[in-house]
């Protein structure tokens, strides 16, 4: 029996989380445990909660929410407080929205997969891209189809995940009948907004909202972003080695 721990950054009630769990339970000889944040934690990246205690709240058998925790908290505490033996796989998702290019650095979904990798466990992040679609309109049927294709191959070693790397999977905003297949691609480059929108409440107090600007991407390169826009699922191996190795020698020369 293979043990899979799943979490997300949309919260324990999110439809994508429950669709993921249902899809995984259709894979033979798999046991699924859910540990998810008690509320939405989008864009919390790979943060841990170090300034207050955390507690598990049992929802059902093998289903817990972690009170006011981040996705990385969920993975860390589940591994050290719930499991006596490490699970075979950590899966984060299915996120309500894509995690493409530099989104990965902000993503709580990807942060949870990073934590799994740091704990020595194979990890995958699944995210559903939306263009002009709503969650209700597009649903998760294609995403679940992709989960059931990829996960057994990871568990069986057909898809190799080296140490300190996780697999980032983004699902295109198309119906299953229009799905074009799978493409392995590098993470692209997002073009982020360079302005902030000022608002005022009825009393005239100023405030700002983050994340409400449309994002573009650098064209002319094959990337996870272009692949998704073409109707393919993107598969991107993400490594945790953040050293810019190509710059090491030049930097050393500056200090000789």
Swiss-Prot record:
GO terms for cellular component: cytoplasm. Its EC number is 3.1.3.5. Binds 1 divalent metal cation per subunit. Keywords: Cytoplasm, Hydrolase, Metal-binding, Nucleotide-binding. InterPro entries: SurE, SurE-like_Pase/nucleotidase, SurE-like_sf. Gene3D superfamilies: Survival protein SurE-like phosphatase/nucleotidase. It comes from the Bacteria. Pfam families: SurE. Its main location: cytoplasm. Its cofactor is a divalent metal cation. The keyword Metal-binding applies. GO terms for molecular function: 3'-nucleotidase activity; 5'-nucleotidase activity; exopolyphosphatase activity; metal ion binding; nucleotide binding. It catalyses: a ribonucleoside 5'-phosphate + H2O = a ribonucleoside + phosphate. Nucleotidase that shows phosphatase activity on nucleoside 5'-monophosphates. PANTHER family: 5'-NUCLEOTIDASE SURE (PTHR30457), 5'_3'-NUCLEOTIDASE SURE (PTHR30457:SF12). Belongs to the SurE nucleotidase family. This is 5'-nucleotidase SurE. It comes from Campylobacter curvus (strain 525.92). The gene is surE.
